[in-house]
Amino acid sequence: MAVSSKSKTGRSPKPAKVQPSKKVESRKREHEEESSDSSESDNEKLVEELDDDFDEVAELLGDDIKDPEAKKDKKKEKKIQEEERTRELTKPTAESNHDDIVTDNFEEAGLSEPTLKAIKDMGFSKMTQVQAKTIPPLLAGRDVLGAAKTGSGKTLAFLIPAIEMLYSLRFKPRNGTGVVVVSPTRELALQIFGVARELMAHHSQTFGIVIGGANRRQEAEKLMKGVNLLIATPGRLLDHLQNTQGFVFKNVKALVIDEADRILEIGFEEEMKQIIKILPNEDRQSMLFSATQTTKVEDLARISLRPGPLYINVASESEASTVAGLEQGYVVCESDKRFLLLFSFLKRNVKKKIIVFLSSCNCVKYFGELLNYIDLPVLDLHGKQKQQKRTNTFFEFCNATQGILICTDVAARGLDIPAVDWIIQFDPPDDPRDYIHRVGRTARGTAGKGKSLMFLTPSELGFLRYLKAANVPLNEYEFPTNKIANVQSQLTKLIKGNYWLHQSAKDGYRSYLQAYASHHLKTVYQIDKLDLVKVAKSFGFDVPPKVNITIGASGKSIEKKHKKQKRA
């Protein structure tokens, strides 16, 4: 299924199209283009069951208990008791630690010959820590709630037991789907699909993928033929479960929820609840992996896992949150020098494989067009692109030995892109968790090495306190000013003289400010402290352009500051 495409470096980029929308809906559409109707929650079902129980008790005790207020209080009390009992039942009964590891050798794990042959073909012999702690209990049929660092080998940890189960049960296409893997993004789903294809090279079982943006009819045809191992994004999976005739899922024996916190973060909580209700739960093994254990993740674990799951956490609180082979640093840079420093860095590292993270789709679009226009070839990846474009870009960069990818956080979670040398956080991350996931695109695997560089303005240095609290070690890097290419005048002249680039720069500038104003860490990222003249220069403007920013009170402060700076 590998796809490739040539990088386009055309001289006349088209104007950017701005499609304003509400924040939550925008983030959700970035990962799925279809939506699904909401259905009643588990709580409503529970209330119905409690009603039945109450009526039975009322018949036994007489009319005195049938007072409406008494009935309401009784239902509320029983509902609370039931939820507490359910939480207690699904509370992990044990936590795996390093002593639980029996072997770190795949050949000693009791795997089938077809799986061992595939693992050998992939070049693996030893398990990572998360694999050694997860695979044996999953092979034994336990439910697992896992927390692991990015780049720890989690994908193999859940795919190997799933494939072994299909093999041992001798699944055939006519049996339909036996394992469902749910992933938050299309790119991550494609990556898991690629790993599954390698692992199942010597197995007879079938595998497939359903994701938003792909051809739904072709997906339905494959499902009707029988897909034993199915990788999916939430919205498209729910669509097929509800609407595809001939999709056999009554034999599902295992459910894997990968990056559960991210799935919930981008707005798929209701879809996941519906998926779990639709899939058969009798004797179903479940595996849930999440980088963070939020209340919503705990609720999802409660309804998806059987009582007493095994909790696996491969990192203690005292350990660094990022992998050992990663060299991390930051540079303090005024806003007007940010692009000049980035341009100089990329020019000096054209033989490296680099990922640059930006805060918005329009910023990625503008800087992609600009860099390609000035003959610094880059690929770009963001949520407003069509799925085929995103897929082509992803695989092209994966297969490249050198090159530059500029992207939004759509590429920050879970993606296993080989041999990335540098991670550049040109626009700062929202919080330490996002920082960790971004840098996790390099130094992957047991012996992986890589470097990361984060750009900070002087007013953003407070973010370092949060990283220190999260056990993230950083060093300050310094770049001599005489080593930075001073191309500001050429940049300004180019933006003035090219209508399409000017419009794209304006859209990028607007979306940068809006993204900045929406940061969660308001004490660090204070939009009132931004020097808009300097910010505008980084986009190629002499003076800040007039832009409409729909962020309420923050938008007003921007306009006032804009006018004040113009008078100065």
UniProtKB/Swiss-Prot annotation:
Its biological purpose: ATP-dependent RNA helicase involved in 40S ribosomal subunit biogenesis. Required for the processing and cleavage of 35S pre-rRNA at sites A0, A1, and A2, leading to mature 18S rRNA.
Chief place where the protein resides: nucleus
Spans annotated as Disordered: 1-100
EC annotation from Swiss-Prot or TrEMBL: 3.6.4.13
Residue spans of biased composition, Basic and acidic residues class: 22-32, 63-72, 79-100
Subunit structure as annotated in this protein's UniProt entry: Associates in the nucleolus with the 60S and pre-60S ribosomal subunits.
Ranges of biased composition (kind: Acidic residues): 49-62
Organism: Debaryomyces hansenii (strain ATCC 36239 / CBS 767 / BCRC 21394 / JCM 1990 / NBRC 0083 / IGC 2968) (Yeast)
Short sequence motif named Q motif, residue ranges: 104-132
InterPro entries: DDX18/Has1_DEADc (IPR044773), DEAD/DEAH_box_helicase_dom (IPR011545), Helicase_ATP-bd (IPR014001), Helicase_C-like (IPR001650), P-loop_NTPase (IPR027417), RNA-helicase_DEAD-box_CS (IPR000629), RNA_helicase_DEAD_Q_motif (IPR014014), SPB4-like_CTE (IPR025313)
Record localization: Nucleus, Nucleolus
Listed GO MF terms: ATP binding; ATP hydrolysis activity; identical protein binding; RNA binding; RNA helicase activity
Pfam families, per the entry: CTE_SPB4, DEAD, Helicase_C
A GO-annotated cellular component: nucleolus
Keyword line: ATP-binding, Coiled coil, Helicase, Hydrolase, Nucleotide-binding, Nucleus, Ribosome biogenesis, RNA-binding, rRNA processing
Residues that coordinate or bind ATP: 148-155
Similarity comment: Belongs to the DEAD box helicase family. DDX18/HAS1 subfamily.
Catalytic activity entry: ATP + H2O = ADP + phosphate + H(+)
Stated name of the protein: ATP-dependent RNA helicase HAS1
Motif (Bipartite nuclear localization signal): 337-353
Stretches assigned to the Helicase C-terminal domain: 325-495
